[in-house]
Design a protein with these regions (language model features):
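Mitochondrial intermembrane space
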Residues: 1-81
């Protein structure tokens, strides 16, 4: 499975989202750098606020099943780190 942060993809570059820019945006939206599973915002009960903030910045959140797995055999090409 892909980490939670990888499920957020820039709508203009799905599958090739700039990781550094996504981290900057995620931090602006309340996440902590390096928290790939988004545990910090989940523990604070702010996941929905985070998701809305990321959408306003031009991201689409894919469900884990839409991303597939990091294994190339099962990767759908929609998510990246």
């Amino acid at each position: 499975m892909w980490p939670g942060i990888a499920e957020f993809q820039n709508v203009n570059t799905i599958g090739h989202t700039d990781s550094q820019q996504r981290w900057k945006d995620a931090i602006d939206c309340g996440s902590k750098y390096g928290d790939k599973e988004l545990l910090h915002i989940n523990r604070q009960g702010k996941y929905n606020e985070f998701k809305i903030c990321m959408e306003k910045k031009g991201y689409h959140r894919f469900w884990p099943a839409e991303c597939g797995y990091q294994n190339p055999k099962w990767d759908t090409g929609k998510c990246n780190l």
